[in-house]
Regions:
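Outer membrane beta-barrel
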Residues: 24-226, 293-308
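Cleavable N-terminal export/targeting peptides
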Residues: 1-15
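Intrinsically disordered, low-complexity segments enriched in polar/charged residues with Gly/Pro
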Residues: 13-15, 57-59, 252
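Extended acidic, Ser/Thr- and Pro-enriched interaction/regulatory segments
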Residues: 18-23
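Surface-exposed beta-loop-beta
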Residues: 54, 192-292
Length: 308
């Protein structure tokens, strides 16, 4: 048999076998494209040296395995799934001790198309549709950590519940809504501890030459019910490894729910990018004055090596 005949026989014998691609990530896909499986993960290491400058706490000099994630994602016809755990920042208690694997994404989804729109519904734990800085994956952040208000009580990153996203076919606009009852963290949630959270986010792209040259504007709203009687907001400064909580309201009783909104904008022009976000959060109390928290973040960067 000639070489061409052998190649033809091999092609015919393997036409129904799954396809394995390694561009960027390893991915296994069925020959007809009806199902896929992809292992995912990331490792990020952080070194930090802080000067507390007379604040009454000790300086900090140390390292941290900031993220060590492992998981998988894929699709089965119109259904999708994703599960990812973090082995680095797992199970932190009030003393910042790590004990168990922390669950990040854990959901199933269903997607469909109608007219020129796409609809995706998720059940499980995924990103809360609210702020921009909490929605951006850590894989694409310029810095190791997010702004102080992001991924916290006033702007949560992931929670467990139901989410829906409606987008145009060309992704020029998007509307997202979610109903959640807290983060799974190590496997469960308690509605009495966190209450109900309703969130809504919309965004549109007024300018888009291609995926590397665009401007996006967005806004979000979040309402949290009063199932939990206590409120507390605290956050580290500078680094996740610095365990001094300079921002700390302590626990305030009589919590009666909260409302928050966020406005944001981002732009990409080749190797240059910029983004900004403003957040306003108000916590209501039965027996104390309301707590108003505002925050903003501005970021800009340029890739010297030409990436976008």
């Amino acid at each position: 048999a000639t070489t061409a005949e052998v190649k033809a026989e091999v092609k015919e014998a393997t036409k129904d076998m799954p396809k394995i691609t390694t561009k960027g990530k390893i991915k296994v896909t069925s020959a007809d494209g009806n199902w896929s499986f992809q292992p995912i993960g990331r490792v990020m290491w952080d070194y930090i040296n802080t000067d507390e400058d007379g604040s009454g706490t000790d300086d900090f000099d140390g390292t941290e395995l900031r993220r060590a994630r492992l998981g998988f994602q894929g699709s089965i016809y119109d259904w999708g799934y994703k599960f990812e755990g973090d082995f680095a920042t797992a199970g932190e208690d009030d003393n910042d001790k790590h004990s168990e694997v922390s669950i990040k994404d854990a959901y199933v989804s269903y997607g469909t198309k109608f007219d020129d729109k796409k609809l995706v519904v998720k059940l499980g734990q995924s990103h809360v549709p609210f702020g921009l800085n909490t929605a951006v994956s850590s894989k694409y952040m310029s810095f190791m950590d997010r702004p102080l208000f992001a991924d916290s009580t006033i702007s949560p990153a992931r929670q467990s519940g139901a989410m829906a996203r409606l987008t145009s076919a060309d992704y020029k606009w998007s509307i997202n809504a979610g109903y959640t009852i807290g983060s799974l963290k190590t496997g469960s949630t308690d509605k009495d501890d966190v209450g109900d959270t309703f969130s809504l986010r919309g965004s549109f792209v007024p300018y888009m030459a291609d995926k590397n040259h665009l401007i996006q504007i967005g806004a979000g709203y979040m309402n949290v019910s009063d199932d939990s009687d206590d409120f507390r907001f605290r956050q580290r400064l500078v680094s996740h490894k610095d365990r001094t909580r300079h921002l700390n309201t302590e626990t305030i009783s009589g919590y009666d729910g909260s409302d928050a909104f966020t406005l944001d904008a981002m732009g990409v022009y080749g190797s240059f990018h910029a983004m900004a976000e403003y957040l306003d959060y108000t916590a209501d109390f039965d027996t104390a004055s309301d707590v108003d928290i505002t925050g903003y973040a501005i970021e800009a960067g340029y890739f010297l090596t030409g990436e976008s």
